[in-house]
Each structure stands twice: as structure tokens, then as C-alpha cells.
Design a protein with these regions (language model features):
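Accessory beta-strand-rich segments of carbohydrate-active enzymes
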Residues: 13-15, 24, 53-161, 165-167, ...
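Surface beta-strand/loop "capping" patches
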Residues: 155-191, 581-616, 671-678
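Compositionally biased, intrinsically disordered or flexible polar/acidic segments
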Residues: 670-854
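Extended acidic/polar, glycine-enriched regions
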Residues: 112, 185-279, 647
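A short tyrosine-centered beta-strand micro-motif
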Residues: 117, 250-254, 649-651, 754-766
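Extended substrate-binding grooves/exosites of carbohydrate-active enzymes
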Residues: 35-44, 126, 131, 137, ...
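Accessory carbohydrate-binding/adhesion or oligomerization-edge regions at the termini
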Residues: 12-46, 118, 122, 128, ...
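Extended carbohydrate-recognition surfaces in non-catalytic/accessory domains of CAZymes
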Residues: 12-76, 129, 135, 141-144, ...
């Protein structure tokens, strides 16, 4: 094991001890790791259902010098998911439940001075009925994934034992444009066996570092006790107010000294003078002025890292969110790293922060106690950030109850009442512990929240709404909002989640619900934005989600990932990110040409709808260096049908103040006989095109057959298109396999004479998937009860049998991506005809790949 030596001075010091830990799953085989760390960064993304939820063991040696004997020592963990038991030199120093808030233990009496000390942490991310979250649409990565700190303080210091807070709380009073007051409540500990005389010195500095106000208070501390001290500053005249457009920050500096003036402890934090209110008719007000909240939700994980993400990348997230034009962020569904809240202070982003009581509760006293503990830790640790305006405690808490078929009606009524009672306790706790903040709760689309009256508890209700994705149409959002406002006119509301999944590899000329195209993502986001902006009573909207994130059970076009982000999992922007910039960024001119797929495949035409985003009113569009058209922007968008040629085409947009240019590499598909392709791929059973980045080929959308092109033949069966929203084993190209053409027995491709390699893509849609589907869709039913052994058919290419008695269920016990490859010689201008002759049941086909060999 690695060893680190420390020697502290006489005043408080904090050392980060992230490097050189040892980790093991079984206490036998150890590996050296650094914090942050998770053991689920890989297994939560493989083809095997589930991921390891259990015990993980960490250990480290630290050296503490002999001159540290007079100090008090704490071991602080900023987050461990989800339960941690800590040992120092074999002594159990404490246990903490909950994976998203900090905790610390005073370890002085367990230390050996002038010697090495053995630190051991047992981490458990097993499902625990008494620790929220019980169930959620995100992965519960196990591990020590935020900083570990060794804190050494003199015997008199700002308390570290008040729910692992900083030991002081900043309150504001009489804040207006004319004046603003600051009151600081501090908790000071004395670990000595005798009384002490101490002093507190507090300063307020402006953003330039100039002293504005200072206060001093002398006091006595009794032996082995703590003391609450309140220091009130006089009001500051004409303060500079904090807002998203002008995030002006003052600074509070705190020094604790002994009677001789020697500094024992010191802390500092941002001060931001602002006040926020909500009005059920007029929306959100900041500093007395109306402001429409528009921003995003954020999950903390990142591609390849799980939740063990370097702080530099996390801070970059906040910068990207601000650059998008956001004025609000919802840290979902748990407290995030404190450094990010500080970043929100600095950049001017209002914060909704919450604890992870998600989907359901357990009807036990232990669950209630852990929930209350979480909220107290949450409030006290994040209290001093001026960006924190909204504090929440539940998300979609009746989601499981609404779909639970096992509980009796009586049991459901009891659970409803228990949930309401817990919510009421947490609401009261939050209002008491966090005055001058707005309490919030997020609900899903269900009348249960109104029936139980749980929606009347918070000051602001957030609705997680997916009209046009899971159900109904985009336009139905406004109908719902108007209905809620009419029925509950005194209730303030915000759209706390919305958005469809989107895969940058997928495009659609006729986008529709649940097709995962970026085209549909733009339609939904812009449609929601329009409807929210038309309604003053809607406080605002936070898109779900800032970036794609891990959700192990999901089996979408990218398995184990929720793809509703406006950025990809690696933080590469999707096109809708740029659209938000066009409507939210007003200070600097902006224009962007959407390039959904650089490789364009145009079927039966030589034009393409180019989409342009800008915050300008008008511009000029150039195609291949020739002025094509003057354009106007509406809601930040211009859509122009543009003629393109085979090969590279340059498209440029100029506005009065800015310009953008991009290239489209165009492949025309107008006649496969006279303009043959070396590679032709077809995404059978769907209207979407899919780009296979590894093969470097686009699977074209499916279509009925027409001369000189391709498609399924008329009178060849029902030719029903089916969606399979599950992970497909043995492939990374789920988007090809997840759409199936059912009962379609003949498919023709008009390719010229020659030798070809033909690969057909199949999957058995009726096999029971091994992964539990938690968020089901109306049209995404699992046909696992069907007699799949009766799907048997022969495969023929130009009347030649390439596979007899083809039976996928007999070959595989899961939804497995199958490729059947054959070589075929085409002569006499006959083209290629694929025949699927049913023996039992209906035929299926998912994709076709044709490669010319000569």
C-alpha cells in the first residue's frame, strides 16, 4: 500500500488524500486506484443484464506526525455510494447511509501519532429498502467517487459536526436595490478541557477585493462544548444585485482566533444579494423582476467514467450549460459536487437542488429517518451558495405505485398516505431549515398527485412531462398546462423535465415520435419552448437532460444509456444544443448550420432541407459559393430546401454580424442500375436512416419498392413495421435490429449485374428479454409469451436457398443480433430479390447490407 506523511501547522488545514488507495471486491485481490473511483464504470454497460451491487473494500495508510497530538482530526468523505463503514486502525469510527452527501468522522482518539495509520472503508451499493433511491432511471454506481479529506484543526474551531457543514450559515435580510443586510450564524466547538477566550473576525469584500464591512466579536467557550454565535452586519447601501445576467459576487471572510490574535480557523464563501419569489399567475421573479427560467437537468456521470468524474470535466459541464444560454439548472436527482454550485454562483445560474427520493418510498421508520437525515445534510452543506434558490426532496414519487399490480387497493391507499406524510415532514423540515428558499417537488404525468393533494405541499410544483414522446402529441402540452392552471389557479408550476431520446447517428426526413432522430428532438424542444413562452403562469422549463447518462436497464439505440440529452454522453453537442443558443443567447450574434449527418444520402431527389439556427432576424444563404436565397429566422430557425450535387457541397450563411459554413458530402440514390454503389445498406422496417460509423456506411430508410431503387414488394404480406425497445446482444448497432419488418416475404433491390456479398440482419422480437423494462411504452410491448418456436422460414436470394428452416429462437435464448451472409452472382439484369418463405409463423427482417465484390 502507498503511504503519505502529513505535518500540519497550528491552524486548521485540509489535505485531499485521493491518491494511492487500494481497492478489492473480496479483500483478497487488491489493485491500486485513485479517488474518484467506481467499480461499475464497465459492467453497467456490457451485454450482461444488471451490474454489480454489493461490497467494495478500500484501504490506505497515512502517516500522522507527533506534533499533531494537540489537534483534532477528521476524516471527510464528500460522497460514497451508497453506504460506508469506516475503520481507523481496526476501530469502527462510523457508518453513513446515503450516496450523494458528504460526511465526516472525528478520528483523533483512534490515531497513532508519529506512525502510520490504517484507513479502511467498506462500501455497499446493494439495494437497501431503507435507503433512497430505491428505484430510478439512472445507474447506482458503487464506490468512493468524490474527494476524501483529512482535516486537522486546533481544539477551538468552526464546527465540523453539524451534518458535515462548514459550521456557519449565511442569511440575508432587507435585500433590495437600495440596501441589503447579512447575518451569519456560526457554530464554534471547544475540544479543550478548560475554558477559552476567542474572537471572530468577519469581513465583507466586493468583487474587486475592497473591504466593504467588517465585524468582530469576542466570546468565551466553556470546556468541551459548542457555542452558537450570530453576527449581524449593518445594511450595505446600494448593493450590486446577483442575477444570471450580472452574477456579481461579494466575498465573506471568517477568521477564528485565540485571545492573542493567532488564527485558529478560517473560512470564506460567496455572497450574492438577490431575492426570488413565484407567482401563480405571473411566474418567477428575481430581484422583483420577471424572468422565465429556461435550462437543463444534469446527471453527474460521464462516458467511460461512470460517476467517478474528474472535477475539471464536471466544471466544464457548467460552462457548457451557461454557454447554451441557460439561466437555471436542476441538479438531478441528488446533490452534486459542491464545486459545481460555486461555479453556478460565479457564472450566474439559478439552482434547483434535491435529494434522491425517487419513484417510491418504503413504509418504515428507518426509511423516514434516513430521508430526513439526507435532507438535513443537503440543506446544511449547500446552504451558503447564493445560486441555490429551489430545494426539493421528491421526484415522481408515485411512479411505481401507478403501475404496481401486486399491491391491493388497501395497501396502495396506505402507501399513498405514508408517502404524503413523509412529504409533509420533509416540506416542513425544508421550510424550517432553509428559509428564504423555494421548496419544490417533481411529479410525473398522473392524477395521483392532485388526488392525494401532495402537489399542494411545495411552493413550486415541477411537472415531468413527455407529451409527444411516451404519449399523445407535442401540442397536448399546452392543453395540460392550461387545464392544471384552471383547476389549481393558486399553484405555481414549472416543467421540470421534458425531451425525447436522440441518437446522432439517426436522421429522418419525416420525423415522428420515438424515432430517436435529432430532427424529432428539435421539433419537440422547439414546440415545448413555444408553448411555455406563450404562458406567463408557467415559471419555466428544464430540459431532460443536459447530456446522455447511464441507465443500465435501458435498451435503446445506445444500450444502457438514457439518450434524452441535448449533448452526447461524451459532451459532444447534439444539434438542438445550438438551437437553444439561438433563442437564449442575445448578447452576441450567433448562427449555426445544423449538420445532422455530414454524409447525406438523397433518395430520388437532389435537394435537401438545410436547417439553420440564429439569433438574428435574417441572413443570406450561399450554396457552393453562389447566393441562393435571402432567409428569415422564426423562433431561431430557418429551414430551406437546397439543391445539392453529387460529392462535396459547401453551404454558407451570412448575417449582418456573423457567419457559419459547413460541407455536406452528398451521395445521390436516383437509379441503382445506372449509378451503382459499391456498398448499399438498408434499415428495414423504419423511416429512419442510420449511420454506422465503424463501417462508414449509412443504412437508408425502408420504403415500398419502385423501379431502379429498392423496397419491399407489393402483395408480399402485411409488411408491418415493429419496434423492439430492448438491448440487442452481439451488436453495437441496435438501431438496425430494433426495427423489424414483419410478415413481408419479398424484398427487391435493383442492383446491376455482378458478384455481391449480401448480409441480412435478423433478430427474434418475441424472445423474452433478460433486462427488466421499467419505463414501458404503449407500443413497445414485449411478446415474450408468444410461441416463438413457431417462427420458422427459409431464406432465398434470387430463388437460391441460403438458409433452410431458419429458427432464431432455437439458436438463441435472448434478443440476439444475427447476420446471415451469402455471396450471389447477379446476371441478366434481374437485380436482387430476397425471399423469406414462411414455414411456421411470420417472417422478420431488420436490415440489408450489399457489398460489390467485382
Amino acid at each position: 500500500m502507498s503511504c503519505v506523511a502529513f505535518s500540519f501547522s497550528a491552524f486548521a488545514q485540509t489535505k485531499t488524500i485521493n491518491s494511492g488507495w487500494q481497492y478489492s471486491e473480496n479483500k483478497t485481490n487488491w489493485e491500486t486506484i485513485n479517488i474518484p473511483h467506481t467499480w461499475n464504470d464497465k459492467d453497467a454497460f456490457d451485454d450482461a443484464p444488471g451490474y454489480r451491487r454489493g461490497l467494495g473494500y478500500y484501504q490506505k495508510q497515512i502517516f500522522v506526525a507527533s506534533d499533531e497530538k494537540e489537534n483534532i482530526h477528521y476524516l471527510k468523505f464528500n460522497a460514497v455510494n451508497q453506504e460506508a463503514t469506516v475503520f481507523v486502525n481496526g476501530h469502527n469510527v462510523g457508518n453513513h447511509k446515503g450516496g450523494y452527501t458528504a460526511f465526516n468522522f472525528e478520528i483523533t482518539k483512534y490515531l497513532n501519532f508519529n506512525d502510520f495509520n490504517h484507513i479502511e472503508v467498506i462500501v455497499d451499493n446493494s439495494h437497501n429498502e431503507n435507503i433512497p433511491p430505491l428505484d430510478a432511471d439512472f445507474t447506482f454506481y458503487g464506490g468512493i467517487y468524490r474527494d476524501v479529506e483529512l482535516i486537522s484543526v486546533p481544539k477551538q474551531h468552526l464546527s465540523l459536526t453539524d451534518f458535515a457543514s462548514d459550521g456557519y450559515y449565511v442569511n440575508y435580510y432587507n435585500v433590495s436595490e437600495e440596501q441589503a443586510g447579512v447575518e451569519v450564524k456560526l457554530l464554534v466547538d471547544n475540544f479543550d478541557s478548560f475554558k477559552s477566550q476567542n474572537h471572530l473576525y468577519l469581513k465583507i469584500l466586493d468583487a474587486e477585493g475592497q473591504l466593504i464591512l467588517e465585524e468582530h466579536k469576542g466570546f468565551k467557550l466553556n470546556a468541551a462544548t459548542s457555542k452558537d454565535i450570530t453576527i449581524t452586519f449593518p445594511e450595505i447601501e446600494n448593493p450590486k444585485l446577483w442575477s444570471p445576467n450580472n452574477p456579481y459576487l461579494y466575498k465573506l471572510e471568517i477568521s477564528l482566533t485565540d485571545k492573542k490574535g493567532n488564527i485558529l480557523d478560517s473560512k470564506s464563501s460567496n455572497l450574492g444579494f438577490r431575492w426570488a419569489t413565484v407567482d401563480a399567475e405571473k411566474g418567477f421573479f428575481l430581484n422583483g423582476k420577471p424572468i422565465k427560467l429556461v435550462g437543463v437537468n444534469r446527471h453527474q456521470d460521464y462516458e467511460s467514467y461512470g460517476n467517478a468524474v474528474p472535477l475539471s470535466l464536471q466544471k466544464k459541464d457548467i460552462e457548457l450549460i451557461k454557454e447554451m444560454g441557460s439561466n437555471v439548472i436542476r441538479f438531478a436527482h441528488y446533490p452534486h459536487a459542491r464545486e459545481l454550485y460555486k461555479k453556478c454562483d460565479e457564472l450566474g445560474i439559478l439552482v434547483w437542488t434535491e435529494i434522491p427520493i425517487v419513484n417510491k418510498v418504503t413504509n418504515t421508520e428507518a426509511f423516514v429517518n434516513v430521508s430526513k437525515q439526507m435532507q438535513k445534510e443537503h440543506i446544511k452543506q449547500y446552504y451558503n451558495f447564493p445560486s441555490v434558490v429551489m430545494i426539493g426532496y421528491m421526484n415522481e414519487i408515485f411512479l411505481r405505485l401507478a403501475f404496481d399490480k401486486k399491491e391491493s387497493d388497501e395497501e396502495k391507499e396506505h402507501r399513498k398516505q405514508f408517502t404524503y406524510n413523509l412529504a409533509k415532514q420533509l416540506e416542513d423540515l425544508t421550510r424550517r431549515e432553509a428559509p428564504n428558499h423555494i421548496t419544490v417537488m417533481a411529479l410525473h404525468f398522473n392524477e395521483l398527485y392532485n388526488e392525494t393533494k401532495i402537489a399542494d405541499l411545495p411552493m413550486l410544483v415541477g411537472w415531468n412531462l413527455y407529451f409527444g414522446w411516451y404519449h399523445d402529441t407535442i401540442e397536448d402540452l399546452g392543453v395540460f398546462l392550461d387545464d392544471q392552471h384552471q383547476r389549481y389557479p393558486k399553484r405555481s408550476l414549472l416543467i421540470s423535465e421534458y425531451g425525447p431520446g436522440a441518437d446522432v447517428r439517426i436522421s429522418a426526413t419525416e420525423p415522428s415520435r420515438y424515432d430517436y432522430s435529432q430532427d424529432y428532438q428539435l421539433l419537440l424542444h422547439s414546440g415545448y419552448y413555444s408553448q411555455v413562452m406563450e404562458r406567463d403562469f408557467v415559471t419555466g422549463m428544464t430540459a431532460w437532460n443536459f447530456a446522455d447518462f447511464g441507465s443500465e436497464f435501458r435498451g435503446e439505440t445506445i444500450p444502457h444509456v438514457n439518450q434524452k440529452g441535448i449533448m452526447q454522453y461524451n459532451r459532444a453537442p447534439k444539434e438542438v444544443y445550438y438551437w437553444y443558443q439561438s433563442v437564449l443567447k442575445t448578447k452576441e450574434p450567433f448562427v449555426h448550420i445544423a449538420n445532422y449527418q455530414n454524409e447525406l444520402n438523397l433518395l430520388e431527389k437532389n435537394t435537401h432541407e438545410v436547417v439553420i439556427f440564429s439569433n438574428q432576424n435574417e441572413g443570406k444563404l450561399y450554396v457552393n459559393d453562389v447566393l441562393y436565397k435571402d432567409i428569415n429566422f422564426e423562433l431561431g430557425i430557418a429551414k430551406i430546401e437546397v439543391p445539392l450535387k453529387q460529392g462535396v457541397n459547401t453551404v454558407k450563411v451570412e448575417t449582418a454580424n456573423t457567419t457559419d459554413e459547413t460541407d455536406f458530402n452528398v451521395e445521390l440514390f436516383q437509379n441503382l442500375k445506372t449509378n451503382p454503389k459499391s456498398v448499399l445498406a438498408i434499415n428495414v422496417g423504419t423511416h429512419i436512416s442510420f449511420r454506422d460509423d465503424i463501417l462508414g456506411v449509412t443504412f437508408l430508410k425502408d420504403r415500398p419498392y419502385s423501379d431502379n431503387l429498392y423496397g419491399y414488394l407489393p402483395n408480399s404480406g402485411k409488411c408491418t413495421k415493429k419496434l423492439i425497445p430492448f438491448n440487442i446482444s452481439n451488436t453495437i448497432n441496435e438501431a438496425v435490429y430494433q426495427t423489424v419488418l414483419v410478415d413481408c416475404n419479398a424484398y427487391k433491390v435493383d442492383i446491376p449485374n455482378g458478384k455481391y456479398k449480401v448480409t441480412l440482419y435478423f433478430v427474434e422480437p418475441q424472445l423474452k428479454n433478460k433486462t427488466k423494462v421499467l419505463f414501458n411504452l404503449k407500443e413497445a410491448n414485449d411478446d415474450s409469451k408468444a410461441d416463438v418456436m413457431h417462427r420458422i422460414f427459409d431464406i432465398k436470394l434470387n430463388a437460391k436457398t441460403t438458409s433452410s428452416q431458419f429458427n432464431m429462437a432455437k439458436m438463441y435464448d435472448d434478443k440476439y443480433g444475427i447476420m446471415q451472409t451469402s455471396e450471389v452472382n447477379i446476371a441478366k439484369n434481374e437485380g436482387l430479390t430476397i425471399q423469406l418463405n414462411p414455414i411456421k409463423g411470420e417472417t422478420v427482417l431488420s436490415g440489408i447490407l450489399i457489398e460489390k465484390l467485382d
